[in-house]
Amino acid sequence: MILSFFHDRDEQQASYRYRGSIPSKYLDIPMGDESADVWVLSKITKASPALLAKAHRLGKRVIADVCDAHLSLPYYREVIEKADAITTPTSLLAEFIWEDLGRMATVIDDPYEFEEILPHVNGKNLLWFGHATNYSGLAMFREALAEYPLRMVSNIEGFIPWSKETMREEFSKADIVLLPDSAPTKSCNRAVEAIRQGCFVVATPHPSLDGLPGIWVGDFLKGVAWASAHPQEANERLMKSQAYVRVRFSPARVANAWKTLALACASSSAAAISPGKAGSTSIANEPVTAPTL
């Protein structure tokens, strides 16, 4: 077996799904298989240095998948410095790793998780979902959004608890998904899932949203007002978003990127892997051909 993903949490963690279980499913491989030639550490934790050392003792190659910008943490730095290859979900995080630690990283997108639903914008029902650490971005707009029905899914006490089935239900009720300010190194997976589920995305500017067609990025309140007042146009734009997402973020495409990198990692010296511009290469930089309206 060429590769296996290692993650010490469960599907409640987004990184477990996007950076482990989903590509594993499409490659038809088990997670945590120590017989694999290449081990992907899908979330760096305090236990990761020991796991990396074990892999190297067994003659395995290690890909460290860096999903958070915790580059000052000693165990993060140790894993990044000793891994045979580095991956990240965003080009900005790859640039930070290059600038701080001098390691090149390959950018591999998060795949989509949810099935595609026809666009269904037909009102002003709002949905926000995310970790408690991202709530501050929404909080600054709460008063200005008081006239809109707003539902919130999070691990914050009193909010709707997250589950995949809950998200399906909440997406089906929502017209517009809100993506206010969040950490600049985060991926666009929340926008992708909202698009897949037929909701129009209104967001403040974010690096990961660059090039994603059809969504509203800019004046946040103006975007909410426009989408709620122009449902037909919002749905037409959403169809463009879905066509793009269907190709770029397909689990099969992302899984193939992991397999390609693992094959290179298994057969090449670490210095030869992914020497792209600014320390990164990216499947996101490959042309994406998708139908447009």
Stretches found by the model and what they are:
Residues 115, 123, 232-267, 276, ...:
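A charged, aromatic-enriched C-terminal amphipathic alpha-helix characteristic of glycosyltransferases
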Residues 1-49, 251, 269, 291:
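N-terminal pre-catalytic "stem/leader" segment of glycosyltransferase-like enzymes
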Residues 26-97:
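Extended catalytic core of nucleotide-activated donor transferases of GT-like folds
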Residues 39, 86, 174-178, 200-201:
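Hydrophobic acceptor-binding patch used for acceptor engagement in glycosyltransferases
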